[in-house]
């Protein structure tokens, strides 16, 4: 059966709400990540904010490389969502999968803003389909060490 975008979002919110309630009983915080698919209800700032309004105890994994899918400004996205962010994925974008700092996302600037905002959590490096994952990981780790130690 065909479901509209809104129906899918409502079902997703209901399921997430149930998961969050069960997890809370176990002392677990549930996070949702902005997703890099134009058809996803969590691919844009407004979609993420809607889920946060529906599920007050749902938290965010902020992925630096995904808001570009909706052509949204990464700094605007951070400011809109930062109060609920408890984890950050460092992902840069290029024509191919690239190391953090090698693509067109302003990684040094956005990660600097995140740190300046008081974020004290981890920065997880994320690459999707890199030809040489090890080399990409080493370059990304070096970028983070050189700029954020």
What are these regions (language model features)?
Residues 1-60, 69:
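Active-site acidic/histidine proton-transfer and metal-coordination neighborhood
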Residues 13, 17-20, 24, 49, ...:
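A structural alpha-helix within SAM-dependent methyltransferase catalytic domains
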Residues 17-20, 59-64, 115-116, 120, ...:
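Short, basic, helix/turn surface patches
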Residues 27-33, 57-61, 85-87, 96, ...:
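Structural preference for beta-strand elements that scaffold enzyme active sites
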Residues 41-45, 49, 66-120, 128-138:
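Gly/Pro-rich active-site loop or hairpin
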Residues 134-149:
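C-terminal helical cap(s) of enzyme catalytic domains, especially alpha/beta-barrels
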């Amino acid at each position: 059966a065909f479901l509209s975008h809104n129906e899918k979002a409502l079902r997703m919110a209901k399921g997430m709400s149930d998961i969050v309630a069960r997890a809370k009983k176990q002392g677990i915080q549930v996070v949702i990540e902005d997703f890099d698919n134009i058809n996803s209800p969590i691919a844009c700032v407004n979609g993420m904010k809607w889920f946060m309004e529906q599920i007050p105890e749902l938290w965010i994994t902020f992925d630096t490389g995904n808001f570009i899918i909706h052509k949204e400004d990464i700094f605007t996205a951070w400011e809109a969502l930062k109060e609920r962010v408890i984890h950050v994925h460092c992902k840069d974008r290029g024509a191919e999968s690239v190391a953090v700092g090698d693509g067109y996302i302003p990684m040094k600037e956005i990660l600097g803003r995140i740190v300046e905002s008081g974020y004290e959590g981890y920065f997880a490096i994320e690459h999707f389909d890199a030809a040489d994952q090890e080399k990409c990981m080493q370059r990304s780790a070096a970028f983070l060490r050189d700029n954020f130690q």
